[in-house]
Every structure is written in C-alpha cells, then in structure tokens.
C-alpha cells in the first residue's frame, strides 16, 4: 500500500511539473519557461538530473501499462543510472515514514468519529443554550478534535444535513443558493443571469 501511494505521489508530482513546462500551465516564468529552471514540485532526487534524464523518469511515470512494482524497479534503476540513488532512497524512506504516520493518524481519527459525533449530537440537541453557547461548545470540541469535527461536518454536508462553510455562499440543499442553482446563482449549467 505504501509503495502504491509512493508511486502515485511521485507520478503526480512529475506529471504536474511536466504540465507546467513549455506549452503547459506554468507560464513563461514557471518550470521550463524563460524564468528560473526547476520548480517547487520537482521531487528532490530529480533536481540534479539532466532534462534528458527527467524525460526517462517521466516516461516511466506516465507508462500506464507497467505494474507498480515494475515502475518502482525502473525508477530505482534510473536513479542508479543518473547517480541519485542515495537521494532517491532518502525520498522513498521519508515518504514511507510519512505514509505510515498518516495511516496511524487516520486510524485514530476513524476510531474517534463515533464518540465525537455523539458529542456533536448532544451539543446540537441541547435546546437550553443560546446559539452563541452552542457555537462555543462546537468550537471547544473542534479545538480538541479538529479533524474529526471537520470530517463529521463534511459528511453531514454531503448527506444534506448542513453547510460545510458558513456565509452567503449558498444554502442547504434545495434552498436559495443550494444545488438547484448553478455555480454562480444562475440556472444550473448556465451563466449567472442579470440580477
């Protein structure tokens, strides 16, 4: 699993960098343009690789017929060919450690969702409080469990229970500014009319 995510991450970064090159979305001062070479999206093990070498890596990243194991083997071979094995191995080790940490945190968050959801339900069902007190209680719970509260609010919004963000960016499903309206308040799929 970690290798799959590692390969996908490397491939995504490389494709993003390739798209930002000449003819891509990077503009004249982006990677590959007339401005500084390289770019922030370049994996560290490719920084000192020639443009021709980067094209070889790119060919592997974009080859959808390779299995992940085959692609990883070819990437490691290219890293050796271009003398960046140590930097590549460090990148892989760092990415693997990061993915392990994410998996651990994800498991903890998933384990907390039921309890945090029950706490949110208790807060929202308490009618003996002001709206401000309710908001403060939710904020206090969010400070203790920020990811869990945001995940639950996101899930509720997907199910039509509440908005993810406040403000005047649209109402609940079917309400003013909700999904029955288009992206800018006009008819779905059409431009915003003259209001």
Curated annotation (Swiss-Prot):
Q: From the record, what ranges are coiled-coil?
A: none
Residues covered by region (Disordered):
162-195
Q: Which organism is it from?
A: Caenorhabditis elegans
Which portions of the chain have biased composition (kind: Gly residues)? Answer: 167-195
Protein name according to UniProt:
SXP/RAL-2-like protein 2
Q: Which family does it belong to?
A: Belongs to the SXP/RAL-2 family.
**Originating gene:** srlf-2
* The organism's place on the tree of life at top rank: Eukaryota
């Amino acid at each position: 699993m970690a290798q799959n995510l590692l390969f996908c991450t490397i491939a995504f970064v490389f494709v993003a960098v390739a798209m930002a090159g000449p003819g891509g979305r990077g503009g004249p001062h982006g990677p590959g343009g007339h401005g500084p070479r390289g770019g922030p999206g370049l994996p560290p093990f490719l920084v000192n690789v020639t443009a021709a070498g980067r094209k070889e890596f790119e060919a592997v990243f974009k080859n959808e017929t390779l299995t992940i194991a085959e692609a990883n083997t070819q990437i490691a071979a290219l890293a050796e060919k271009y003398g960046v094995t140590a930097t590549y191995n460090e990148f892989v080790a760092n990415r693997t450690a990061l993915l392990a940490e994410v998996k651990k945190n994800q498991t903890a968050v998933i384990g907390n969702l039921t309890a945090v959801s029950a706490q949110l339900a208790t807060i929202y069902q308490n009618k003996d409080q002001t709206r401000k007190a309710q908001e403060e209680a939710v904020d206090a719970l969010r400070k203790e469990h920020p990811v869990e509260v945001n995940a639950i609010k996101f899930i509720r919004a997907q199910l039509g229970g509440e908005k993810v963000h406040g403000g005047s960016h649209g109402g609940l499903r079917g309400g003013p500014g909700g999904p029955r309206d288009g992206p800018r308040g006009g008819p779905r799929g059409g431009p915003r009319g003259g209001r």
